[in-house]
Amino acid sequence: IKSDKIKLKKGKPKTDINSSLKYISLTNKFYIIPDDSIEVFNQINISKAVSSNLQKPIIKNNHINKLTIKYGTKLKSNNIHISKIIISHLIKLNLEKHVYLTIIEKKIILIIFDKKELIFYNQFDLSNNNYVKYLILLFDEYKLDQKRDKIYYISSDISKKKVLNELRPYFFSIINHEKSIFDIITNECK
């Protein structure tokens, strides 16, 4: 499969229908938990305290490099969360401390990696250009320098020129990531 042949389809797939297809969950209601904390997490009824999304019929666990990603779904199989796909890709790179940004299906995803270690991951709904505000807050929180530290933009179906033009007044080192989000999805879902 080539990334230019990926077709995004919105909707709510039914359980066990089209089982040869892979479904990517974009839900904002998920948890990334270090494996050494998973037992404590499982003892807490987190869905009552934080999110009702984990009360769906099936709670999926995606695993990657000593991390567990938990999210609720109606699908029994062929379901993977977008965070696992992106983390799996970035963890293979030998990285200095970098910030990553991608936008897919009206979801903003912000990530900080430092030498194959996930420092920060968050995703939320896109509203106008609120990713600029969140990037500024992220740089402030992690004491990053807007003139020196790099932002890698993982391109998607949003106009790359528009995103870069909105970021340039605030950030000086914006680099296009070598692969688009669709290339990453294609490679990680083989």
Residue ranges of predicted features:
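Hydrophobic/aromatic-enriched cytosolic interaction surfaces used to assemble or bind macromolecules
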Residues: 1-190
